[in-house]
Structure formats: structure tokens, C-alpha cells
Amino acid sequence: MSYPLFDKDEHWHKPEQAFLTDDHRTILRFAVEALMSGKGAVLVTLVEIRGGAARPLGAQMVVREDGRYCGFVSGGCVEAAAAFEALEMMGSGRDREIRYGEGSPWFDIVLPCGGGITLTLHKLRSAQPLLAVLNRLEQRKPVGLRYDPQAQSLVCLPTQTRTGWNLNGFEVGFRPCVRLMIYGRSLEAQATASLAAATGYDSHIFDLFPASASAQIDTDTAVILLCHDLNRELPVLQAAREAKPFYLGALGSYRTHTLRLQKLHELGWSREETTQIRAPVGIFPKARDAHTLALSVLAEVASVRLHQEEDSCLPPSS
């Protein structure tokens, strides 16, 4: 497929990937930068999956009027074609919907997974909805975007939002970045913090538990205890009990965890509360070195988060 395009300044543009990212904050900022500088941009959203797909429902990309784009709505097989469609529609000013893979008129664009996807292309008219989303995420609050194809409008939903079609609009829910709170003066803690730096998570490592740290624990936080000392764990566990992080894991053997549970029950913890603690921490049994343990812990955190995100998607409309 060729990509000649005639823009308002009578220049030809070809779609070009600006950089690789699937981080929604980076994608939305890319759009905001264009709009704030007076340039046009299109928001592309994955709104339907038929069969398998490489990206989740609600995945997005942004295409600027100069042809540069970022984000993913597939495994990389339709992004250039979608960018071409976005550039073409900027001239008309009319939003559109396109299908790729199964059920698509484009026989030369095949999804390796064998399924099909539907994308909506919305010409952004204001940066305000995107700025509102970014501001909520900066405040570590859940937020959503609602796109109405008939009105060709985009609005911010200042509340927790499930991704999917809702009445005549498609809504995308966003959660704050995962925050890792790692506690312990140990090789395991250092290795976990080092590996976490590559994940894009907001990572913090502590030796002792500062009083100010309890305010940083929220429902998008993973609390990881790598202390080798049950008594030093207790202030962190008590803070986590109130804040309810989505993940709470602790280092130690089954015997150590039995002692931990005894201490917590003495402090008034219920059985339901103590079952929220993942111990021994990690998905690999009996990890014997620090880096394997770090990988095991972060894999478990990612798994729990993934299940949480899957639960936030609406079932397909009938």
C-alpha cells in the first residue's frame, strides 16, 4: 500500500512512526502537544475485536497531521495503514470507522492472529478532554474517555470507567501508573528495585517505614516486603491494611508466614484480611537467588494487575 497525501499546506506526507510506546499517558501527551501548537491530530481507538488480537480493547494511537504517529492498536501490522486513513480523513473533517482482518475489505492487510479488529478515527478538536484525563492520572485517580461517533465528540469521565461500548458511545478506562513500594535492606529488595526500573512502574525502595509513606499507598500500589524481619514488617502491613493496595506480598518461607499470620491475628486481623498477603512472595517456588526472586515478584505483580485490567472491560454488546 502506498501513502501519498496532500495536506492543507500542499505538502506530501507519508505515515512515520515517531517512537515506540503503548503507554496511554505518552500517547495522549503526543496528541496534546500537537493540538497546543495548532496542529491537527487524530485519535485512533480499538473498539471491537473479532477472534484474537494483539492489543486489548481500548488500545489507542495518535496520528499528527505531519504523518508522525505513536501508539499501537495491533501487533504492528495495521498501524501504518490506520495512520494513512487518519491523515486522509483530516481533510474531510468527518470521523470514520475502519475494519481490518476478518470482515475487512482490505485483503492485503492480514492480522497474523487470524482475527479482525474495528477502529474508530476521531479528529481531535480540543486538547481539554485529554488534559483532564492526564490531570486525573497525575493525581492518581481513575478516569475515562467517552467517544460518541454520532456527535463526533470526546469527553472526559472523571470516575472509574469500564472499557467498552456503553449505549451509543465507546468508553476507555484509565488507571494510574502502578506504584511499587519495596521495603527492606536486602539484596532481594535492591534487585527488585533495579529490575522494576525497566517496567515503567513508579518504583520506590525503603529501608525503614517512614510515616509519610503510608499516604503513598493506594489501590494502584503494589506493596512488596523483602525485609527478613517480621517486626519491621508490621508497620507496613498495618498501613497496607487500611490503604488496600492491589498487591501485597511478603518474603519468607511457609514457616515464616505462619509466624507472620500469628502476629497479625494477635493484632486483630481477620482471616479474610490475611489471605490478601501473597507469601511466599512471587510466582516461582523456592527462588534461591535475588534476581530470580525479583523476576518472580514482578511477574506476580504484573499478573495480578492484568487480571484487574481484564475485569475492567465490558463484555461485547449483543
UniProtKB/Swiss-Prot annotation:
The gene is paoD. Disulfide bonds: none annotated. Disruption phenotype: Mutation results in complete impairment of cell growth in the presence of cinnamaldehyde. It comes from Escherichia coli (strain K12). Keywords: Chaperone. Coiled coil: none annotated. Gene3D superfamilies: NAD(P)-binding Rossmann-like Domain. This is Molybdenum cofactor insertion chaperone PaoD. It comes from the Bacteria. GO terms for molecular function: molybdopterin cofactor binding; protein homodimerization activity. Homodimer in solution. Interacts with MocA. The keyword DNA damage does not apply. Chaperone required for the production of an active PaoABC aldehyde oxidoreductase. Stabilizes the PaoC subunit and is required for the insertion of the molybdenum cofactor into this subunit. Binds molybdenum cofactor. Binds the molybdopterin cytosine dinucleotide (MCD) form of the cofactor after its formation by the molybdenum cofactor cytidylyltransferase MocA.
